[in-house]
Every structure is written in C-alpha cells, then in structure tokens.
C-alpha cells in the first residue's frame, strides 16, 4: 500500500530582519509547519536538505542576496578527535549523562538564564521567560530528548546541572537543536564536550550523522564548527566535505540565491503529491 501526505506542505517566507551572524546583512527564512502524523517523516526528509526545526516549524535560510549559512553535519564513522578534543573528553569524564523526555524544568531554566545572561545578553533569546523556554523544549511533534549533564553528587538531588541539550532524533542521526551550559565552568569547554558526547551517542545508536545546525564562513559565532573532523556542509543542493574552511566565502551578490519559487520546486517531499507548494 502506498502512503502519501494527505496535503502537500505549504512553504512561506519571513520578512527580512537583521542577521545575527554577519553584521550589516539581512536574513530571510523559508519555512513550513511541522505537524500531524507525518511530522517525523517530513522532518527526516527536509533535514537532509538543510532544514532545521524550531518548535513546530521547519526552516532554512533563504536570504535575498546571501547564501552564507550552510547546514553542517559530522560523519560519525569518520570522525577523529583532535588532541584538544580528547583532552576535553577526559576533563569531563566525571559528568553523568541523563536522557529525558522533552519536559522543561526549573533547574534547566535557571541554567539557561545564567548561560544567556553571560554569553548572549544582547541576543534574540535574551528576554525569554520560563513559559517561552518551556515551549522551546516541549513543543515538538517529532522524537526529541533533553540530554542533561550533571556533576557527581551523593544523591540525584545533589547533582547540579552542568549542561543541557535539546536533541532531535532523525532516521539518520541526531540533531542538536539547542544547547546551553554553566558559564562558571568555562575551563571544562562544555559546549565542545556536548558535541563530542553526541557523536558518541550516535555511534552507540548506529546513527551515521550528528547535525550541528548552520556553519557560517566569516562568523566568529559559528566558526568553531569547522574544528570538527569529518564535517560535511549542504551546499549547491548536495552534501559535501567541507574541505578547507577558508575556501568558502560569505559573499553578497543578488545572483547567489535562486528565486523562492525555484527553491521550493526543488525540495523533495516524502511521497508527496506534486503541485504548487509556495506562498509569499
């Protein structure tokens, strides 16, 4: 029996707003709703084409004159940690990992607030209250987990949270939706450790990829992702090895981006009916 999506998803475009990664540029996103019984299949399919999830929405950068944001993922089987990354793993070997359902807690929010206030006080999420935080964690129509990392303690109640990551589970890997950590533990390099541990989780689960979100050449905020071996980027409609990061440019040109209608026409859907799928 052939199963199809009852209604082909509609794609929309956000209004331009200030880019959080490259100064002086405007960002625009192509997005669609993620809902219903076919949400997991749609998410699995579009994630392979550079889309990311935010609550009940799948989106991909579609800026008018810029194509700098490149979806990035690590090939788990080929990953080899650097000497520095091995030291990070050793330094955090005492942390306890706990995978839970996507349910927000006060301890998570307290850590989230400390992280934002220290690292991203002027960012777009700086004003998030506990209800918005709960929505970010809990509003997921697909398989998601919250991975908590705690320091040793005598009892479960005496194990302070060190780091947290909201993680989606795809048919081909893990996607790190959002992570945050204790800013007072800077010496542990917890951001790097959470990535390294997700590579290990994927390896144990037999999943080939860990999706890191977007790598942006020229952005200091996103430059760290290029330090991981076996990194692939989604560029020109296909996944390819990143090669030398310096070979990629964040150039600004009106011909660097195809029209929205052409972008949407090339999106592969899971056994969907053909037809017009874009709306401005």
From Swiss-Prot:
What keywords would UniProt list here? Acyltransferase, Cytoplasm, Transferase
Q: What subcellular compartments does it reside in?
A: Cytoplasm
**Intrachain disulfide bonds:** none
EC class of the enzyme, as a word: transferase
Pfam families, per this entry? ATE_C, ATE_N
User: What is the organism field in this record?
Assistant: Cereibacter sphaeroides (strain ATCC 17029 / ATH 2.4.9)
* Function text: Functions in the N-end rule pathway of protein degradation where it conjugates Leu from its aminoacyl-tRNA to the N-termini of proteins containing an N-terminal aspartate or glutamate.
The reaction(s) annotated as catalysed by this protein in its Swiss-Prot or TrEMBL entry are: N-terminal L-glutamyl-[protein] + L-leucyl-tRNA(Leu) = N-terminal L-leucyl-L-glutamyl-[protein] + tRNA(Leu) + H(+); N-terminal L-aspartyl-[protein] + L-leucyl-tRNA(Leu) = N-terminal L-leucyl-L-aspartyl-[protein] + tRNA(Leu) + H(+)
GO biological process, any: ubiquitin-dependent protein catabolic process via the N-end rule pathway
Instruction: Please give the name of this protein.
Output: Aspartate/glutamate leucyltransferase
Where it mainly occurs, coarsely classed, is: cytoplasm
UniProt family annotation = Belongs to the R-transferase family. Bpt subfamily.
* Gene it is expressed from: bpt
The record's section on InterPro entries has: Acyl_CoA_acyltransferase, Asp_Glu_LeuTrfase, N-end_Aminoacyl_Trfase, N-end_Aminoacyl_Trfase_C, N-end_Aminoacyl_Trfase_N
Q: Which GO terms describe its molecular function?
A: arginyl-tRNA--protein transferase activity; leucyl-tRNA--protein transferase activity
Q: What is its EC number?
A: 2.3.2.29
Q: Which lineage do the record's taxonomy fields give for this organism? A: Bacteria, Pseudomonadati, Pseudomonadota, Alphaproteobacteria, Rhodobacterales
Mind telling me which GO cellular component terms the entry cites?
A: cytoplasm
């Amino acid at each position: 029996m052939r199963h199809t999506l009852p209604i082909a998803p509609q794609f929309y475009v956000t209004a331009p707003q200030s880019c959080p990664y490259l100064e002086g540029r405007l960002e625009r996103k192509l997005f669609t709703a993620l809902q219903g019984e076919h949400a997991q299949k749609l998410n699995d399919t579009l994630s392979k084409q550079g889309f990311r999830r935010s609550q009940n929405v799948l989106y991909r950068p579609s800026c008018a004159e810029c194509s700098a944001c490149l979806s990035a993922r690590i090939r788990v089987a080929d990953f080899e940690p650097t000497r520095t990354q091995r030291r990070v793993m050793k330094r955090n070997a005492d942390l306890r990992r706990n995978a839970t359902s996507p349910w927000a807690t006060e301890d998570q929010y307290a850590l989230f607030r400390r992280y934002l206030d220290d690292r991203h006080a002027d960012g777009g999420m700086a004003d998030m209250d506990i209800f918005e935080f709960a929505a970010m964690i809990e509003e997921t129509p697909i398989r998601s987990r919250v991975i908590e990392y705690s320091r040793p303690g005598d009892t479960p109640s005496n194990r302070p949270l060190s780091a947290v990551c909201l993680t989606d589970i795809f048919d081909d890997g893990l996607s790190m939706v959002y992570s945050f950590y204790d800013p007072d533990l800077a010496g542990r390099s917890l951001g790097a450790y959470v990535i390294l541990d997700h590579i290990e989780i994927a390896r144990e689960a037999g999943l080939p990829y860990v999706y890191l979100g977007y790598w942006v050449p020229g952005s200091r905020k996103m430059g760290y992702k290029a330090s991981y071996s076996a990194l692939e980027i989604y560029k020109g409609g296909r996944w390819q090895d990143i090669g030398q990061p310096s070979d990629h440019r964040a150039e600004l040109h009106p011909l660097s981006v195809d029209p929205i209608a052409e972008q949407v026409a090339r999106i592969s859907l899971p056994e969907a009916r053909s037809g017009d799928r874009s709306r401005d």
